[in-house]
C-alpha cells in the first residue's frame, strides 16, 4: 500500500483535506467577474487549494510563478509562452491583431514548447500591456483564469511596476486573476494597505490552519487499519500536538509515522521516533541556517523555545534590536506572528531545543 500522506509538492485528490470553506469562496469568486487574493503563511497549501479548486472548473488557466521572472519583459514573454501553449499559433493570430510590438515566436525542436523574444530596446511597458491585452481578448464568455504565484516579487523587478500592472489589470473583464504569495506580511502590505496600488483589487481569502477535528479525522482514516481505533486516535492527537495543525508539517510527520509503522509495527513512542528521525535528517540544513544567523537572531530563537517568555523581557540587548531581529526572522519565514511570535517549523524548534540542552 502506498503511503497516504503527501508533502513537499502539490497536494490534490485523495491527499487533499478540508478547505471546503476556502474552496467554496474561491469558486464563488471564479464564477463572478472578480479576482481572488490568497493570503497565508508559507506552506499552508495555497497552491494545492488553487489546483484542487480548478480541477472542477472547465476553463483555460495560465499560471506564472513570479520568482522565475526577472523583468517586465520576461513577464510578458512568460505570458505569451503560456498563451501559445493554450492556442496554436495559426489559431492565435487573430488575438494578436492589436499588438503594437509583435513578439518573435519559435518552437523548441525537441520539446515543441513555444519560445518568445522581443527586439532589444523595445518599449517595455508597451510589450507588457500588449501581452496582458492578448490574454484579455482571448477570454470571452468563459473567462480566462490567470494565476500569479509569489506575486509580491513584482516589487523587486522594476520601480512602479505594481502601478502599471494595476492600471492594466483593472480594465479587464474577461479574466479572473488569482494572486497569491508565501510572504504573508508582503501580501498584506500589497493588498490590505490603502496606499498600495492593489488595495481592494480582489476578494481576500485568508488560509488558516486546518481545524484540529478535521485534521484528526483525516489522519485517523489513513493510518493503518490494522491498528485499533484508539491507537490511531492517540497517534493523530500526538501528531497534531507537535505540529499545531500546520498543514505541511502535519503531512510530513504523518508520512514518517506511517512509514515507521509499516517498518516496525511498533506503536509505542512512534510519534517521538518519527520526530527524531526528521530532525536528524535535517541536521545539516538546520546547522547551516543557524550558522548564517547573527548573535541576536540566535538569542531570540533560544528565548522563544519557552513560548511564555516574551523575547523583549529580561534581556541585556536593547528592545529595538530585538524587535529588528524579530522582523528579520518573520520576513525570512523562520518565525510567524499570530498574536505572538512562534516558530514556523516545529522540527527546527525541536533542533534548537536539543542544541540548547547540549
Predicted regions and their residues:
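A short, basic N-terminal segment
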Residues: 1-36, 41, 89, 358
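Short amphipathic alpha-helical interaction segments
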Residues: 316-332, 342
Amino acid at each position: 500500500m502506498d503511503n497516504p500522506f503527501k508533502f513537499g509538492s502539490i497536494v490534490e485528490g485523495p491527499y487533499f483535506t478540508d478547505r471546503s470553506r476556502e474552496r467554496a469562496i474561491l469558486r464563488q469568486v471564479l464564477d463572478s467577474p472578480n479576482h481572488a487574493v490568497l493570503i497565508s503563511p508559507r506552506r499552508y497549501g495555497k497552491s494545492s487549494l488553487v489546483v484542487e479548486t480548478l480541477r472542477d472548473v472547465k476553463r483555460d488557466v495560465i499560471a506564472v510563478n513570479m520568482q522565475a521572472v526577472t523583468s517586465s519583459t520576461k513577464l510578458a514573454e512568460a505570458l505569451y509562452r503560456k498563451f501559445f501553449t493554450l492556442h496554436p499559433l495559426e489559431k492565435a493570430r487573430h488575438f494578436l491583431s492589436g499588438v503594437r510590438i509583435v513578439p518573435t515566436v519559435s518552437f523548441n525542436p525537441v520539446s515543441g514548447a513555444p519560445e518568445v523574444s522581443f527586439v532589444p530596446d523595445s518599449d517595455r511597458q508597451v510589450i507588457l500591456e500588449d501581452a496582458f491585452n492578448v490574454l484579455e481578448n482571448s477570454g470571452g464568455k468563459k473567462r480566462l483564469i490567470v494565476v500569479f504565484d509569489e506575486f509580491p516579487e513584482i516589487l523587486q523587478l522594476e520601480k512602479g511596476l505594481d502601478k502599471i500592472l494595476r492600471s492594466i489589470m483593472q480594465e479587464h473583464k474577461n479574466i479572473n486573476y488569482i494572486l497569491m504569495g508565501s510572504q504573508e506580511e508582503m501580501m498584506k502590505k500589497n493588498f490590505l494597505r490603502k496606499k498600495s496600488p492593489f488595495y481592494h483589487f480582489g476578494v481576500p481569502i485568508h488560509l488558516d490552519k486546518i481545524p484540529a477535528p478535521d485534521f484528526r479525522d483525516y489522519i485517523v482514516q489513513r493510518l493503518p487499519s490494522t491498528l485499533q481505533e484508539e491507537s490511531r486516535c492517540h497517534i493523530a492527537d500526538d501528531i497534531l500536538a507537535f505540529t499545531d495543525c500546520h498543514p505541511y508539517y502535519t503531512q510530513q510527520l504523518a508520512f514518517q509515522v506511517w512509514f515507521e509503522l509499516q517498518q516496525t509495527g511498533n506503536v509505542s513512542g512512534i510519534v517521538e521516533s518519527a520526530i527524531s528521525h526528521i530532525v536528524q535528517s535535517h541536521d545539516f540544513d538546520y546547522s547551516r541556517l543557524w550558522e548564517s544567523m547573527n548573535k541576536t537572531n540566535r538569542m531570540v530563537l533560544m528565548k522563544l523555545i519557552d513560548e511564555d517568555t516574551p523575547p523583549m523581557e529580561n534581556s541585556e540587548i536593547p528592545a529595538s534590536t530585538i524587535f529588528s531581529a524579530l522582523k528579520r526572522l518573520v520576513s525570512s519565514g523562520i518565525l510567524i506572528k499570530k498574536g505572538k511570535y512562534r516558530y514556523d517549523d516545529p522540527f527546527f524548534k525541536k533542533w534548537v531545543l536539543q542544541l540548547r540542552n547540549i
